[in-house]
Structures are given as structure tokens and as C-alpha cells.
Amino acid sequence: MPVAHPVITHVIYDMDGLLLDTEPFYTQATQAIVARYGHTFDWSLKSRMIGKKAIDSARILVETLRLPIEPEDYLCERESMLVELFPTAKAMPGARRLTEHLAHHGIPRPWQAVHTGEITN
């Protein structure tokens, strides 16, 4: 007896790092901010921040480097840099092929930008 496969009716994308290569922008923005205070943003610090909520990562950064800014101020500044950088993001391998395939089959595909929570078509 053949196995029935579920029918895909909708797809919601996480743009950051799935369809667009945005990860380097977070590092670039953070490095630019901490450099103003005489610090570098290295892997030992970044690895402690990955996977956490933005505010928790910001606290780790500010406290570890003893930056003279509040975590919220860092996030605000980083966000303004990301807004400038994101339009230059390159598609991840296979992203265009996947989105074109879904479009060809009429599957709605809204996407979400995780850093803002914005969902759009």
C-alpha cells in the first residue's frame, strides 16, 4: 500500500539565515559598535550569545566587555545598522529554486524577519 504524503498548503519562511545570508551582518554590526570602545567581537564571546533572545545576548555583550552603554542602546544601534545592511544580503544556496518551485505550484509563502517579527508576502 503506498504511503500518503501530507499536502503542503502554505510555507512561512524565516528570512534571516534561511533564504538570505544575513548572519555576517550581525557580526559586522556588533564589531563596529564594540570597536568604538576599543574591543573586538571574537568567537569566544559570539558563541555565548548565539541562540539567546536578543536582549539576553545584548546583556552578555555589554557586561562581558563592560561597555558604557545599556543593552537596549546596543540593540537599537545594531538594528539601525542591520536595516542598512540587509538589502545587500545574498540568497542562500537553493533559496531561489525553492521559492520558484513553490510559486509555480501556487503555494502561499509569506516570510518572517525574526529580528523584527514582521510577517509579509
Question: Across the structure, where does each feature detected by a protein language model lie?
Answer:
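Active-site neighborhood of HAD-like aspartate-dependent phosphohydrolases
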Residues: 2-47
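Short, acidic loop-to-helix structural element flanking the phosphoryl-transfer center
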Residues: 7, 84-117
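Conserved functional loop/turn residues at catalytic and ligand-binding sites
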Residues: 16-21, 53, 106, 115
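Short beta->alpha linker loops
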Residues: 25, 49-53, 77, 90-94, ...
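Short amphipathic alpha-helical interface segments enriched in basic and hydrophobic/aromatic residues
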Residues: 38, 62, 83-86
